[in-house]
């Protein structure tokens, strides 16, 4: 399936119409994908924060934000502006360099991970052959930033929160990677594009969630733990650690943690939709739509329609998972730190390893169903 809107090609052709050379058009294009990722991530965070406030209000029989814009849609922007104008404080006995580097080291890998998220056949920033491996590698950097922030704050609550965050992230990253390996084993590829295309054979029935139900559950639990969402928010448990590794942070440094947490949640939901829910896949084949409209499959109208539907389907699937994550936050109690680590090491790790071995066996026995 090599159809779909190619943004880079279309943009370069548009600039060539003004007499610019291919080299200049390519140079102009280079910074745009990263800018597009930043805008998409920030807009996604604003929507998610608004949903969080409204869903939490409904769970507690409240109204939630209603005065800042219609239905309170401007409340997340007001929150961001408030953090933007707050004083940036560095504690007197803190390590200033590490204290500042910590939030950056937490946020940057999460944003870079968006580079491998496809919204269509050609709608992604970087179609690297090792896309999933790159995401796992980038996500392993985050615990360093969390531990660095806790240590540099020179605060016992911050240090304990940083240690908890690092232990939690390491504990759940291994079963998460093993559940992803089962998908890679069936797809024979680390490319996110190939993983989605492999699920396009029979519509919804070819989604990986039917062949990897255990992997799906393990991945989603681990993703929630990596995002430090309830019931796994031990690193910043208010009743125990004030705000964990964020205790001494204020202003934009605190906003970077806040932003990184929500961007990571949206990223995790997008990856679940790509790995297990068919990504941009539409129930009706594009070939039938093109035939119905009596147009070739590479016609501009079909390409725009395919790109639009791909974005809508990917985002809808992702936000369904975000809704579930928000609902879990306001309906489940927090686990203890020993229960958290026991769940990761003694339960999810053996299950994910067994799931990988069973997938390998099923691939040998039923190659037509498990990607022989």
From Swiss-Prot:
Which sequence ranges are marked TM in the entry?
27-47, 97-117, 128-148, 176-196, 204-224, 266-286, 308-328, 347-367
As recorded in UniProt, its EC number(s) are: 7.1.1.-
| Record-linked InterPro entries | NADH_UbQ_OxRdtase_su1/FPO, NADH_UbQ_OxRdtase_su1_CS
Give the subcellular location. Answer: Cellular thylakoid membrane
| Pfam families (alphabetical) | NADHdh
- Gene Ontology CC entries for this record: plasma membrane-derived thylakoid membrane
Report keywords, A-Z.
Answer: Membrane, NAD, NADP, Plastoquinone, Quinone, Thylakoid, Translocase, Transmembrane, Transmembrane helix
Source organism, top-level taxon: Bacteria
The keyword Membrane belongs to this UniProt entry's keyword annotation: yes
**Biological process (GO) annotations?**
aerobic respiration; photosynthesis, light reaction
Q: Provide the membrane topology annotation.
A: Multi-pass membrane protein
Q: What is the catalytic activity of this protein?
A: a plastoquinone + NADH + (n+1) H(+)(in) = a plastoquinol + NAD(+) + n H(+)(out); a plastoquinone + NADPH + (n+1) H(+)(in) = a plastoquinol + NADP(+) + n H(+)(out)
| Gene Ontology molecular function | NADH dehydrogenase activity; oxidoreductase activity, acting on NAD(P)H, quinone or similar compound as acceptor; quinone binding
Its biological purpose is as follows: NDH-1 shuttles electrons from an unknown electron donor, via FMN and iron-sulfur (Fe-S) centers, to quinones in the respiratory and/or the photosynthetic chain. The immediate electron acceptor for the enzyme in this species is believed to be plastoquinone. Couples the redox reaction to proton translocation, and thus conserves the redox energy in a proton gradient.
Protein family (similarity comment): Belongs to the complex I subunit 1 family.
- Summarize the subunit comment: NDH-1 is composed of at least 11 different subunits.
According to UniProt, the name of this protein is NAD(P)H-quinone oxidoreductase subunit 1
Q: Which gene encodes it?
A: ndhA
